Amino acid sequence: MYLLDTNIVSMLDQRRHAHAPELIAWMKRNGGSLCLSVMTITEMDAGVLKLRREGKPDRADQIAGLVTAILTDFADRVLAVDLETARHVARLGELTHRQAVELPDLVIAATAARHGLILLTRNMSGFSRLGVPARDPFVDLPTDV
């Protein structure tokens, strides 16, 4: 099973489908094996709020609609931060304290580790130092699950 990083989930936006048709088709075929971290929802909601603050209500509404659809599609596969995950975040933060890894990436990596998932991300350099199995589906699309 896989955990989708926010930069992969963002490809579900209709405006980005043309950039990743193989990935979108793979995600549709393997949807039941894909999970999200609550941090992805946090990042997407923050993006909606930023767009509104910047006076881009139409784009904000599009992304808000995408978040709603994602929450429906992934209802039972949005993984919360439990105590074990939170403690793993702290350990990863200490491991990378000199590398300034952002908290959202630490939470997503810890969530993948906690649940034994492979992280799908475009940010291989950011996650490779965290010791979490990860792959870039634009370079190496997984086989169907």
Label each PLM-derived region with a short phrase.
Residues 8, 40, 85, 107-108, ...:
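Alpha-helix capping/helix-boundary segments
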Residues 46-52, 72-120:
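Active-site neighborhoods of divalent-metal-dependent phosphate/nucleic-acid chemistry enzymes
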Residues 11-12, 47, 88-89, 130, ...:
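Residues that scaffold the ATP/ADP-binding catalytic core of kinase and kinase-like folds
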Residues 43:
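Acidic-residue sensor for enzyme active/binding pockets
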Residues 1-40, 50-68, 129, 143-145:
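Short, well-structured N-terminal submotif of metal-dependent ribonuclease cores
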Residues 1, 109, 113-145:
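Acidic, PIN/NYN-like endoribonuclease modules and their adjacent C-terminal/linker elements
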Residues 37, 81-83, 122, 137:
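Conserved beta-strand termini and adjacent loop/short-helix elements that scaffold enzyme active sites
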